[in-house]
Amino acid sequence: MSEQSPDSSRRRSRFRWLHHAFHRSPAGRGWRRGSEFELMHRALGFAALGFLTLVPLLIVVAAADPVNRHGFAQWLAEGLGVSATSRDEVLDLFAPPRRSLETTTAFGLATLALFGLTFCGVVQTGYEKVWELPPGRWHTAWRHLVWLIVLIAYLLLSSHLGPGPTRVAVAVVATVLFFWWSQRLLLGGRISWGALLPGALATGVGLWGLRIFSRLVFSPLIASSAVSYGPVGTVLVVQSWLVGVGFVVFGGALVGRLLHEEYLRLVTWRRKRRRLERSGGP
């Protein structure tokens, strides 16, 4: 067998060094956490269950909004940030608000609320997996109802904001506060407010990044899919957007935990360095 060339050995050595450096870096730890957490799998579950359980409830709630009578389709179009043409396709996908109210019974509304609580449980489980916490006890299920009510209020507030820079500022602050509080509530206060703040900030930034991405990608995709596949094409794009929302919600929490741990490592390193300097060590 021929001996390997020095250049080949150096390349393998450099590759091993880069692999080891990445493995020990914050990015490497984040990659491993995301793989162990099965981030994409949970985002797909978030989108599927959200579309089946939460969206029907929001359709009825939006139809009953006395201020904004455009219904849930208008909410969704605003969230997607789509163009006027794509907005029409989204509006055509759902029944008019008045029809939604006329065909909804008290039993149907109670069933929709129960389904919405199931979705809240999925979000709570995701946050618990991010922080490697045991499942919450059954008597804390009231938190799901509180979270669902505040979620609806948050969406109502977002739909009533007027255009302009003020809307962007208020929406960003409201998003960060909502997800900061959501983690604290659904985790049952087992993680401190300070540790949860980076995750809320990462989620807020990620959702606004998703909005920009939606305007650039999903908006023309809705128009082309509607022509090619009809309403089914629009549904597929909306589902893809919900996958992105789930990815950002859980991914933001993962990034937040990683940032918090890196901050703690930095604080520990600085304290050790100060102690060494005071003791006259190297």
Regions found by a protein language model. Name each.
Residues M1-P282:
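Membrane-embedded alpha-helices and immediately adjacent juxtamembrane helical segments
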